[in-house]
Structure formats: C-alpha cells, structure tokens
From Swiss-Prot:
It holds the Pfam family Ribosomal_L18p. This is Large ribosomal subunit protein uL18. The gene is rplR. Part of the 50S ribosomal subunit; part of the 5S rRNA/L5/L18/L25 subcomplex. Contacts the 5S and 23S rRNAs. InterPro entries: Ribosomal_uL18_bac-type, Ribosomal_uL18_bac/euk.
Length: 123
C-alpha cells in the first residue's frame, strides 16, 4: 500500500513534468523557473539547450538579505520578479518562457510573474 507522502511527492513530480514537457528555454528565450518551499522562493533563468543556469535569485541570496527580502510572501515575490528581470536585462534577455513547476499560477508564483513583467520581461 502506498503511503500518503509518496502519493503527494509523486503527484507533484508528475504535475511538474506535465508542465515542463511543453517548455524549452534557449539562450535567447530562457525558461524562468519558480520553486517555492515552506519558507523560501527560488527563481532561475535557465538555458535548456546548454543545460546552464543563466541567473538566479532567492530569498536566501545575499542581495535579498540586504534588501530585506527574506520571507516568503507576495510582496517579496514581486520584488524577486523585478530583480530577476534586472539580471535578465543585464544578460540581454527580454523574452522568457514561464515555468510554474507543479504549483498553480496563483499567489506567490503569480506575483513573481507580475514582478518580472514590471521589470520588462515579456512572456
């Protein structure tokens, strides 16, 4: 018999694969990946062709700690979206593919996307 924890984690992995199988990022149009945990938010620009992370920021990063963005809430998520847009602009990236992972496009995930749009990234 399967445990409830196993069902939960395998279901989350299936949802993430279902979303990611349609998304491919390149150096010109990288994938903006959002991962959230119970305490933190992680945002990355990923080039899937090379298999490299172009830029990343999280609520654990030094730049976030100096800005006071250390907790997982919607205000900080929006600020992280703006900061990842600035990092993308410095890499001459203006178009992205948004990867919400296994999460609904709601709350913190939606605020990261809104912040990235405000920062000048186009989806």
């Amino acid at each position: 018999m399967e445990s409830s924890l196993y069902k939960k984690t395998s279901g989350k992995a299936r949802r993430a694969l279902r979303v990611r199988k349609a998304l491919k990022g390149s150096s010109l149009k990288p994938r903006l990946s959002v991962v959230k945990t119970n305490k933190h938010i992680y945002v990355q620009l990923i080039d899937d062709v090379e298999g490299k992370t172009l830029a990343s920021i999280s609520t654990l990063a030094k730049i976030s700690k100096t800005s006071g963005l250390t907790k997982k809430n919607q205000d900080n998520a929006k600020a992280l979206g703006v900061k990842i847009a600035e990092l993308g602009k410095s890499l001459q990236v203006d178009r992205i593919v948004f990867d919400r992972g296994a999460h609904k496009y709601h709350g913190v995930v939606a605020m990261v996307a809104d912040g990235a749009r405000e920062g000048g990234l186009q989806f």
